[in-house]
Amino acid sequence: MRRYTFQLLLIPMLSLFWLTASCTHRDVHFRIGVSQCSDDEWRHQMNNEMLREALFYDGVEVDIRTVKDDNAQQIEDIRHFIQEGVDLLVVAPNEAAPITPVVEEAFDRGIPVKVFARKILSDKYPAY
């Protein structure tokens, strides 16, 4: 009887294991890189909302990088996203002039760019 009980428990436990293991694996088909210029409460909330929305779509991954009003770091982060080959780049520029060339670089490489919060000094982005 004891062996039978163990076998009865083993089958549901293994089923549960396989079910949870399959839920944790997500194939990423669309990568979004987000470059934030600062990390105040408003932007924290925005980041959390973007991450939450991405959970509703299988295969979507959002990578958010935040700088603390540092143009050089933001340029480095955007270049990282370009090298990683993101499918969409979302940028909140710290300042327009320093960030414009790297956003143009992403655009010229065929990466769609969404600029928000402030514009850059170029028209090489499809959405503001």
Give residue spans per PLM region.
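Composition-driven detection of intrinsically disordered, low-complexity segments
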Residues: P12, R79, S122-K124
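Bacterial carbohydrate/catabolite-sensing allosteric modules
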Residues: R26, L55-D58, A127-Y128
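Flexible loop/hinge segments that line or gate small-molecule binding clefts
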Residues: A96-Y128
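Short hydrophobic/aromatic-rich motifs at helix boundaries and adjacent loops
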Residues: A21-R26, N48-L51, Q74-I75, V115
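Extracytoplasmic "Venus flytrap"
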Residues: R31-E53, Y57, V62-H80, E84-V86, ...
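Basic side chains
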Residues: R2-R3, R43, R65, R118
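Short, low-complexity disordered leader/linker segments with a strong preference
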Residues: M1-F30, E104-I111
